[in-house]
Amino acid sequence: MSRVVALVLCLLAPPVCGAAEFSVTPIRLYFEPGTRSAAVTVTNEDKRPLRMQLRLMQWTQDADGADVYTDSDALVYFPRLMSVQPGEKRLVRIGLKTPAGAAERTFRLYLDELPDPADAASPPAHSGLNFTIRFALPVFLPAAAAAKPSGAIEALTLRDGKLRVAVRNTGNRHFRIANVAVRAGEAFAAEAPGWYLLAGASRIHTIDIPAGVCRGLRRLDVTVKAEELSLQGGLDVEPGMCAP
């Protein structure tokens, strides 16, 4: 969905909620090969003005596959501060500074709602919380060479009833894992949620297998389901691999 709905946060909050409602299109920005610029549309769907600040962060992943964000000026983007009136749309333009590299480069463009100065000047008489919205737009810059998703299950281990599935992105572009599914015939089935796996990164997904179930298993079949690829693996189970 392209819509950032502040109403959800308001329903979870006490009577006062200061967050605006707006939409961002697209929700993921892909630069096509040879493209030097792109645009994002922000629509104010609220009844009051929307003030926003924009900030670019480089998006990488560490040795464990955890997301790491650092300030970046690798792209040109404007405006960096903007006001959007109710019902209006504003374009955010993004441009490249340098040519494509050997691997895809990934960023997040943060669109932060700024508090309404009137709210700060005149606090509500009744108690409550004021929320603002942050939207993190993924931005993908393609590699110079043809990009094709490629991955591998590096390792499958079962120890003390914990199945660990190590997945590596062996390609030059990201892919998004939908889930990691494990099955043992009709005896056991489970899934672990997935996430983005950037080029060259790896992540371990863990699935717990109950001790009583684990001891009756002979083999586990694992499938890593991603948007554009599927990886399969298997592991023979021995009782000593299960939780005591």
Each model region followed by its residue ranges:
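Intrinsically disordered, low-complexity Pro/Gly/Ser/Thr-rich segments with frequent PxxP/GP/PP motifs
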Residues: 67-100, 187-214
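Terminal connector regions
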Residues: 97-142, 146, 212-244
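Short, hydrophobic/aromatic beta-strand segments
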Residues: 48-56, 65, 151, 174-180
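Asparagine-centered strand-capping/turn motif at beta-strand->loop junctions
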Residues: 42-46, 166-171
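N-terminal signal peptide c-region/cleavage motif recognized by signal peptidases
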Residues: 13-16
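Beta-sheet-dominated interaction scaffolds and their linkers
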Residues: 19-45, 81, 145-160, 194-196
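Bacterial N-terminal signal peptides that target proteins for export
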Residues: 1-6
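Short aromatic-acidic-glycine turn motif
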Residues: 58-71, 117-118, 183-191
